[in-house]
Amino acid sequence: MIQFFFKLNDTELNKQLRFEAFYYLQEFNFNPRLRKQKYMLVHTNNKERKDYLKNIYSNEKYIIKLNPNELEYRIENSKEQKIKSYDYFISHSSKDSKEVQELIRKENSLKKNIFCDWINDIDYLKRHLLCNATLRVLEERMKQSKALIFVKSENSLSSIWCKYELNFFYELQKPIFIIEKDSIINKDFELKTINDYWFIDSDYKESTLIFASKIYN
């Protein structure tokens, strides 16, 4: 089974399937290489089929009808979910996804296991499914992480989600590191220990639920 996922990670043209294989392997503490789409080979001489595979099939997506309550149940009852552990939990704005992916590639190259919610728990943690279970799932993933990396940007500084994650991780008394979005763009991946606790809010959980309910309902 593991060999199958390594092969899928190395050769699959569909981006979503390749990412699924990559993060499945990562979750079990393997260190696969995340290949960029432009380096994937299309093994056919048929021009029409090559165009389809390269431009259409590679971007096709499927929808998994799952929700945070189901993932919470899996975490509580599945051995597979319980053995997951991460070196870093990435707290970030989804608007900075390009830079976050660069950071993940860098940390993976250093043999670090990364948790990023829109990748590892794809379809479970969609923000429009927000509920207490969503927050409990995030909390469990943070408990499974040794440290947190906050990707600082204008987007993340105004993110209610980042504030929630930072507050919860602070309560866990685990290391919190910070990296500027611009630093990632400039290929400077040095992590610095956070020394500005601007985010601390004793009512952060309630504030997050109230804010999100106004946005998504």
Where are these regions (language model features)?
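Residue-level signature of the C-terminal ends
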Residues: L25-R35
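An anion/phosphate-binding loop that grips the pyrophosphate of nucleotide cofactors and donors
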Residues: S145
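Conserved TIR/SEFIR loop-to-helix hotspot centered on a Trp-containing motif
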Residues: E154-L172
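Conserved BB-loop
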Residues: L110-L138
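Alpha-solenoid HEAT/Armadillo-like helical repeat scaffolds in large eukaryotic proteins
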Residues: F4-E12, K36-N45
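C-terminal interaction surface of TIR/SEFIR-family domains
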Residues: L13, N45-E80, D182-N217
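Conserved hydrophobic register position within alpha-solenoid helical repeats
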Residues: M1, R18-A21, L53
